[in-house]
Amino acid sequence: MIIKPKVRGFICTTTHPVGCEANVRRQIAYTQEQGMIANGPKRVLVIGASTGYGLASRIATAFGSGAATIGVFFEKAGSETKTATAGWYNSAAFDKAAKEAGLYAKSVNGDAFSNECRAKVIELIKADLGQIDLVVYSLASPVRKMPETGEVVRSALKPIGETYTTTAIDTNKDQIITATVEPANEEEIQNTITVMGGQDWELWMAALRDAGVLADGAKSVAYSYIGTDLTWPIYWHGTLGRAKEDLDRAATAIRGDLAAKGGTAHVAVLKSVVTQASSAIPVMPLYISMAFKIMKEKGIHEGCMEQVYRMMRTRLYGEELALDEQARIRMDDWELREDVQQTCRDLWPSITTENLSELTDYTGYKQEFLRLFGFGLAEVDYEADVNPDVKFDVVEL
């Protein structure tokens, strides 16, 4: 079939298999151009490995460090008449490229919050790799099915304490609007911590430890975002921030646990990027459009791949971790530069529907957004007939 983008809200309901593969190939090429990561990991588990920072982590370790990788994700396959999710095509493309390069790659498609998924991954590690030396935790899910009770808990992207009103972009109409978000109640706050906090990361690390599949000196990293005063009301001071604080709590606990065998665990705070997750957060598309323009002008713009590769090479496996006072690895250092932030603050009040594309990189934002789904890549022929049913070596749970 010939596949065209269909955008609804913050999701594109169609995806392009050839475009997604081209995207993955671009990220692999970038990694290979940068060269190998000295003393990098060799056996890696990525939990949340199919898009965004998780996919970039899998690429960085496999193609930048020659690592064998196991990727866990929850994606939908395509059929002859329906496209798969982008993460399915990304993972298929990664699998193909890894095998071409002679690298071990196994993928598990299932609910990463489930005990069944943990058991399957441990079985794979024992059978194929023995142990692992890096665990990347990069899950972005709005819901979590509790492993013991089966209860489904939903997160809420809301401010805490007071109603938040701000300028935002209606990405469907490309218009500047006033967005109002009501504050969360206590239950919504707790639910968001349950879904997006550090508890599941702890469960994974405990299961891996108890099974004896963590190598001596194993490292673990979980991804977070803090942002700036421009986004704090909806993010860091909101329900998401509470969940991310819980991630910090979990990191401290896991770090204490791994220390006995020379291992370590940290939260890595990353920059804002265009992902399916960030496009769902009010204000983020506008903030990202501004930050992108300024950072591109200053030559300090990074996407997921550049950011993760820099973290792996210069921090996690580099000279020094350069931690903040909460023992976090800060990769948002360039975005938080005062010159970048002040320009954003000055710009924010003056943005209108008319000057949106001129004052910000909203055009770039939209291009990046479509690229997540495999559209808008120059090297892809979008008039060609393609088969949406892409098969690859994946363990289905």
Swiss-Prot record:
Residues at the site labelled Plays an important role in discriminating NADH against NADPH: E75
Biological process per Gene Ontology, one example term: fatty acid biosynthetic process
Q: Where does substrate bind?
A: Y225
MF-aspect GO terms = enoyl-[acyl-carrier-protein] reductase (NADH) activity; NAD binding; trans-2-enoyl-CoA reductase (NADH) activity
Pathway assignment: Lipid metabolism; fatty acid biosynthesis
Q: Which family does it belong to?
A: Belongs to the TER reductase family.
In its UniProt entry, what is this protein called?
Enoyl-[acyl-carrier-protein] reductase [NADH] FabV
- Please spell out the taxonomic lineage of the organism that makes this protein: Bacteria, Pseudomonadati, Pseudomonadota, Gammaproteobacteria, Aeromonadales
